[in-house]
């Protein structure tokens, strides 16, 4: 009897096309589910006969209670090599092997620049106005050359951001808890003397940190209050790094110029969420990693993970 594998949250209905699953055909029956289930009981009904699950980032949390309702589950694969929505301890207790796939940094970096440029050039309101016969040239754009980009985090994506910023002729400041002046200089950036200084001096602040106990809530009321009234905040990292209530306040009161957001504490974003309504927010539905090359890598390596597991030699194990 073949093992049953389900790919969850295949929103674009491309998972089965992005990799060659035929190598598994003799031993595994693979199906993809495009619908997103918010009710755990309903989800468990759909998955209770599955031996293998392939999940996309944190779209569907793998909680202890859900794992307990999946008696057949043997292998859980996530895109990326980190997933805070998986209860690794509960998976281990149940003997579920958890594996990951590698993730490219180009796509989220490019999306960050798309948001930044969209805000600076007022692309969405200008386009909407044009299509609706609104005012011609409604807003005054912001020139990037000579402006300061503040990077909260200078890892792989942050470093790429710094290099692109220099091509625009921007000054780059960077800060994180362990960042040194030498490391910043390697990317052509200056080390900000403090976190507050980064927010005070930057025209654009872009967040590029992994969510952890240290980074959760790292951007709060004090940091947002220190920003220039003409400055923009961009977060394509993780929503919980920023104090949501504080961000909503400064946006509603227009104490900063605006925000570009690709990540939210609840995803999909509820229909009545304030971030859907604020005119000074440019928001996208967590599409930073949703790109052709990333998806090919995710699902190709998911096939590899399954094949290795079937051979008794799991690869890219988490936990």
Please name every model-derived segment:
Residues 1-99, 200, 220:
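An N-terminal-biased, well-structured beta-alpha scaffold segment characteristic
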Residues 10, 154-155:
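Glycine-rich Rossmann-fold phosphate-binding loop(s) that bind the pyrophosphate
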Residues 45-48, 61-66, 178-274:
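Rossmann-like adenosine-cofactor binding region
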Residues 158-159:
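N-terminal Rossmann-fold NAD(P) dinucleotide-binding loop
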Residues 2-3, 92, 100-111, 129, ...:
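C-terminal helix-to-coil terminal segments
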Residues 52-55, 78, 206-207, 235, ...:
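Redox-cofactor binding/interface segments in oxidoreductases and associated redox assembly factors
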Residues 28, 96, 189-190, 280-282:
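Short, conserved active-site loop motifs that form the nucleotide-linked donor/cofactor pocket
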Residues 94-96, 100-148, 152, 163, ...:
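Phosphate-binding beta-alpha-beta segment of Rossmann-like dinucleotide-binding domains, i.e.
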């Amino acid at each position: 009897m073949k093992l049953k594998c389900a790919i969850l949250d295949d929103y674009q209905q491309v998972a089965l096309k992005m990799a060659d699953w035929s190598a598994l055909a003799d031993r595994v029956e693979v199906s993809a589910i495009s619908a997103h289930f918010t009710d755990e009981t309903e989800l468990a009904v759909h998955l209770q006969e599955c031996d293998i699950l392939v999940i996309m980032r944190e779209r569907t949390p793998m909680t202890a209670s859900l794992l307990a309702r999946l008696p057949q589950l043997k292998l859980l694969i996530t895109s990326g090599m980190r997933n805070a929505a998986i209860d690794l301890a509960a998976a281990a207790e149940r003997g579920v092997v958890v594996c990951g796939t590698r993730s490219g940094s180009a796509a989220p970096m490019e999306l960050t620049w798309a948001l930044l440029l969209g805000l600076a050039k007022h692309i969405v309101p200008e386009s909407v106005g044009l299509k609706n016969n609104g005012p011609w040239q409604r807003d005054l754009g912001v020139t990037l050359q000579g402006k300061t980009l503040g990077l909260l985090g200078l890892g792989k994506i942050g470093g790429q951001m710094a290099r692109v910023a220099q091509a625009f002729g921007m000054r780059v400041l960077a800060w994180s808890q362990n960042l040194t002046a030498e490391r910043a200089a390697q990317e052509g950036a200056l080390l900000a003397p403090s976190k507050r200084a980064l927010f005070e001096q930057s025209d654009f602040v872009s967040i590029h940190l992994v969510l952890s106990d240290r980074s959760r809530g790292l951007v709060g009321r004090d940091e947002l209050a220190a920003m220039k009234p003409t400055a923009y905040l961009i977060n394509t990292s993780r929503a919980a790094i920023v104090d949501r209530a504080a961000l909503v306040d400064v946006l509603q009161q227009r104490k900063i110029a605006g925000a570009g957001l690709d990540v939210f504490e609840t995803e999909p974003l509820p229909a009545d969420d304030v971030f859907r309504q604020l005119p000074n927010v440019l928001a996208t539905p967590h599409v930073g990693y949703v790109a052709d090359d990333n998806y090919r890598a995710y699902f190709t390596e998911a096939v590899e993970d399954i094949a290795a597991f079937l051979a008794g030699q799991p690869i890219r194990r988490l936990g």
